[in-house]
């Protein structure tokens, strides 16, 4: 069974430079059962931002591993522009390496050693950078595919987070798959949701 599971990373929307690193941890569930974790580490120094992301999940059905994903990624940004990106993925046995580097007015992307130059304004689909919500195309950092994207503002909703109810704005991001993310009025991620190819509900919630 192959599950289409997005790699979701989110930080605060906006905000100024921070001297200390940020580490964000999320638990990933499938139909309310924990299947993995997602971690984002962000270091800010003036106009430079370095980001490390890690996703590890395993889906078991009747004690048999049906799907496994391991993804590790680093990004380096200066003054809002992507300088370099490197990722490795093991998607249920299918391995990919993806890299990107600024080259002239474009972005050179290498997928499993094959290079192409794309528009420098394409955003990685790691979702930590809220600028992605404004762009029509993104780079899937798991396998290097260039994907058109559209974003719909679903308005504000009440979302239960542990024992609290949080007022949050919902965005639906449509691309190879559709997923929803919710942000509170401070720009914090409240939760994320997508429906996998087998109909199961995948949720990302902060630890």
Language-model region placement:
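Bacterial N-terminal signal peptides
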Residues: 4-14
